Design a protein with these regions (language model features):
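Hydrophobic ligand-binding cavity/cleft-lining segments
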Residues: 1-50
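Alpha-helical scaffold segments that form or flank carboxylate-/histidine-based iron centers
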Residues: 26-27, 60-61, 127-130
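Intrinsic-disorder/low-complexity, polar/charged segments enriched in Ser/Thr/Lys/Arg/Asp/Glu/Gln
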Residues: 15-21, 58, 67, 80, ...
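Hydrophobic/aromatic beta-strand elements that line small-molecule binding cavities or substrate pockets
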Residues: 22, 70-74, 95-103
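Glycine-rich portal/gate segments that line the openings of hydrophobic small-molecule binding cavities
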Residues: 45-89
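Short, highly charged C-terminal tails/helix-capping segments
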Residues: 143-156
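Hydrophobic pocket/interface hotspot
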Residues: 31, 41, 59, 72, ...
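Beta-strand/loop substructures that line and gate deep hydrophobic ligand-binding cavities in soluble
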Residues: 89-137, 153-155
Length: 156
């Protein structure tokens, strides 16, 4: 048993999923393109996108300090975007991110799920906590970009 799992109360479900909801003032087609179009994605999330974001494609997201791959599993503009990616540098933990887009009034209701994060595996608890913090920040950046055309990423 890992040190992380040893600290959990008996009977604890050892899988966690990050779930977040965000309302945006743009239509679902616009919001989903911010995820599914490499040029749009690079305006708010990574510094650069290498490759396309087609279903079945492996794409690499590039930041100054890291490179992370995405495998796009499913994409329907205005409805759904699903991909897999690693949370740990050695790729011991790979999660599936499912993002849905639904019309809500004059805008979009975005629902994001990322997981599962196995709390009983080394690095699982830390990756889950990092995902909660990271997705909170990234969804704030998405809102700034889609609703206000503002890039909140830190620049050197």
């Amino acid at each position: 048993m890992s040190d992380d799992a040893a600290r959990l109360p008996a009977g604890t479900d050892l899988l966690r999923t990050v779930r977040m909801t965000l309302r945006l003032n743009a239509p679902p087609e616009r919001v989903s393109r911010a995820w599914a179009d490499p040029e749009e994605l690079a305006r708010w999330f990574p510094d650069r996108v290498e490759g396309g974001l087609a279903v079945g494609a492996r794409t690499v997201l590039v930041w100054e300090s890291q490179r992370v791959w995405w495998d796009v599993i499913e994409s329907r503009i205005g409805e759904l975007f699903v991909f897999r990616w690693p949370w740990l540098p050695d790729e011991r933990l790979v999660t599936t991110v499912r993002i849905t887009f639904a019309a809500a009034g004059y805008g979009t209701l975005l629902e994001l799920e990322d997981g599962p994060f196995p709390l009983d595996r080394p690095g699982g608890i830390d990756a889950w906590a990092e995902a909660i913090e990271g997705w909170s920040e990234e969804l704030a950046r998405l809102r700034a970009y889609v609703d206000f055309s503002v890039d909140l990423r830190e620049r050197q």
